[in-house]
Amino acid sequence: MDGMRRMPPNRSFEMKKVVVFTGAGVSADSGLSTFRDADGLWADYRIEDVCTPEALRDNRAQVVDFYNMRRREMLGKEPNAGHRAIAGLEECFDVDVITQNVDNLHERAGSSHVTHLHGELTKLRSSRDPELIVPIDGWEQRLDATAPDGALLRPHIVFFGEAVPMFERAAEIAGTADLMVVVGTSLAVYPAASLVRYVRPDVPIFLVDPGNPDTAMIRNPLTHIRSRAAEGMPELAERLKSEFS
């Protein structure tokens, strides 16, 4: 996202860089379905039927309908306390959010700089040119909608089996962190999970997740807060502001 970062007066050169890496657990706390859920939108669909290039080729109508449903679900949800706490870090830090989530709840909570690794529900792209990306107004993509280049539009989502074009940029951002916060992710989806390897070895990493994420790749000083995002992130945000700003 473009635009100036919000900075308190006379503190721009003191501000530490906080990189926040978020996963499905943050969205789940707003009531959004995730592909690991046993219920919700994903319960009636196999991933290979709605989230692969082959599915788009062989059953375009089902794929478009599925993402219309996801988009409509997203528009009916609100950012939770975890999203708001992450956005609130900008009061004291230079913050970049890297998310595996395809919803826009970080932006709606007020985060200024969000990198979406796996695409965005609020956008469509040309089936011919992956760089030709357009916003979608509302939740419904028409089956016959075309891009400015005349090609059929598709969801701006990184399907399973496709490259993750924003990963290199995300790795660069991770390498600039003075503090790293990892929220609501099992650290099991690659290449996204490997972002923690790009953080400088002396940088503290704070992990907020109620489960047992795979931390084998983390060699940094690690603090694990065993809470859901909406509960643990507000507490951690206050701690970071108190100890590091």
Per-range role (PLM):
Residues 2-245:
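Conserved catalytic core of sirtuin-type NAD+-dependent deacylases
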